[in-house]
Amino acid sequence: RSFLEFAGQMDCAQTALYLSACNIPSKEAHGRVVEFLTEPSLTALLQQPDTSKPKDLRNLVFMILMYDTAARCSELLDMKVCDLRLDAKHPIAYLHGKGRKIRTVPLLSKTVQHCKQYLRKFHPSTDCHSEAPLFFTVIHGTQQKMSPDTVAAFFAKYGRMAKSVCPEVPEHIHPHMMRHTRAMHLYQSGMPMVLLSQYLGHSQVETTMIYAHADTEMKRAAIQKADAVRGTKPVPDEIWADNEEMILKLSGLL
C-alpha cells in the first residue's frame, strides 16, 4: 500500500489502484508468543555444563550472566572485561544496547562469584580496565570474540541434555529465550512495567507489554484447565424433580 500510495503521488493515474488496495482488509495479526523457561527448566539447563571443563565453565557463566542481566546475546558478546564492576559496593555490569545506548544492570552476589571464577580462569593476567572481549574463543592461537553461532550451539546442546531429565524443558532452546525468561520471572515477581522496560533497555513501554499479555494468557489457560476438570464432575440429580410436594414446600405454598 505504501508503494501504491507513492506511485499515486508520482502518477495520478495510479491513484485509483491505490484506493482499491486500501479496501482490501488487512490480515489479522496474531500476538507474538513469548518463549521462556519455568524455574525447573532453568535449573535443569544450568545443571548441564561440566564445570571441570574450561569451555563448559565459560558457557555456564555466559548463561548465568545472560539470565541475571536479561541481556541480548549481542550485548553479552560485545561485553569487555572493563564492563564488569565486580568489586564495587554494588556490583554492576555495563551493557551496550541498541542505538549505542549503555545501561547499567545490578548483579546478584552468586553471579559475581561465578564471574570472578571465570575471570581467574580465562583472564588471569588481564587488568580489570582491559577492553579485551569478556567471552572469547581461540582460533589458530588467537583470541577472538565469541560468535553467535557458538552460543546457539551450546544452548541447543544443553537444551537437549536438560530435556532428557526435565520434561518441562522446551523442545528447542535458543539464547534469546534466556532474556524472555528473566523478564517473565521479574514481571511475575512484581517488578513494575516501567522499571522492567528500563531494565530490558526497551525504548517504549509498549514493547515490554508482551510479558503482561503472556502472563495473562497463562492465567487464562490455568482457569480454562480448572473449568475443564470441574466440567467432568457429574451434575447432581434434581431431588425435587417429579416431587410436587417438595416443590410446593420450596415455594412456600405448603
Sequence positions of predicted segments:
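Conserved catalytic core of the tyrosine transesterase superfamily
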Residues: 1-254
